[in-house]
Amino acid sequence: MVAQEQQKPFVIGLDLGGTNSVFGIVDQRGNILTTNSIKTQAYKTAEDFVSAGVEALKPIIAKVGGIEQIKAMGIGAPNGNYYRGTIEFAPNVPWGHDGVIPLADMFSEKLGIPVGLTNDANAAAIGEMQYGVARGMKNFIMITLGTGVGSGIVVDGHMVYGSDGFAGELGHTIIR
């Protein structure tokens, strides 16, 4: 089973934004092979969003040889909780204020592959640490600005998630 898993050369990435959500298939070197997108704001429920996302994934998965070529999926999302694989009370996603949404499990059920989820700024920091300008850096902060504002904090080469999974959520900071 392990040898079979290692032969799967691609992963799916989802950058879930408050306005648009972009799906991509990436190889082991971080090269984006193909993408598709949907309007995040077009869906009233998480279930509708996941169904539309799976439909958007079908043609790009087919381009790389089918789901059997996909090892896993990673999601970067506002208010994403790495520990739980959930989006929690996300005000900048139409269906996000419904409470705690088990988005990783929802996609995993539909696709039949493992799915991980983290805060979108943390995902950006991890990407920069592995493939971008933060390669080799042990300590840095990645600031993101889109529909919301966030940060991914890296200390001693490790992502800081905090005790509850929400370290770096700058958009929820009260400044007086």
Question: For the regions a protein language model found, what residue spans apply to each?
Answer:
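Conserved Rossmann-like nucleotide-cofactor binding loop
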Residues: 19, 31
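Short glycine-rich anion-binding loops that position phosphate/pyrophosphate groups of nucleotides
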Residues: 78-81, 146-148
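N-terminal phosphate-binding loop and adjacent alpha-helix
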Residues: 32-69, 99
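Glycine-rich phosphate-binding loop and adjoining helix at the ATP-binding site
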Residues: 46-54, 69-73, 79-139
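Conserved catalytic-loop position in the HRD/HxD motif
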Residues: 15
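Glycine/GP-enriched mid-protein hinge/lid loop-to-helix segment characteristic of carbohydrate kinases
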Residues: 2, 8, 26, 34-37, ...
